[in-house]
């Protein structure tokens, strides 16, 4: 057995995710234009999403600074993937994890968080993430735990600057021309764009946003909703709006035509990448497949 194939811990398996070229969706048009569309499979991370990276980073670095220690209670407001990733990271590092989120999250996410040992507090869906964040802040003020605050924590985009961005650059051998990401906490797009723009300012950075009246899990419409403090708009060249119907249709197409079992926000980013591909030539367009489709089975996006 080759020892270099053995990871010392599960946290060492986070990152270095595959970058896969789409083969069928838009194939004829892409071949004609000389474009390549690539999906970075962040669902391959141990807890199943791109959020594994910042979750572990926020806990590790807070611990290194002496802000927290194993056995402490951590608090976070989250709509899903960050909660699952934090639950895993807290289990690895020995923390009690309390997650606060709107009550309309999918049952798969809630069950997964509990499987990792996290405690859940559900808030009224009418209050959205703002209500959940306010409650987390109140609990911290009352001394009930330490809030990691993914929306304002610089360790969130920093880990994408240090890992996700360099991986994309290396995997494309510097040929990447466009980067597309859904925008939730904005940690991914902020960190990756910062790295890629340093490498090549000509690389276009595109954020996927829900169109008016659409609700896509994992994507929030900024600045109509709470604008994260970590968001750096200076490196984002364009926002493209995707409807819920188009995102869900692309979700099904990715599974059936490419064999990529992606979540709805990932499919929204793919849809945006396809729109960009219709406007350019000889481009290498990468998008983040931020999680897997099994977290959305109860939503009805996939036919029974």
Show which residues each predicted segment covers:
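PLP-dependent amino-acid enzyme catalytic core
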Residues: 1-304
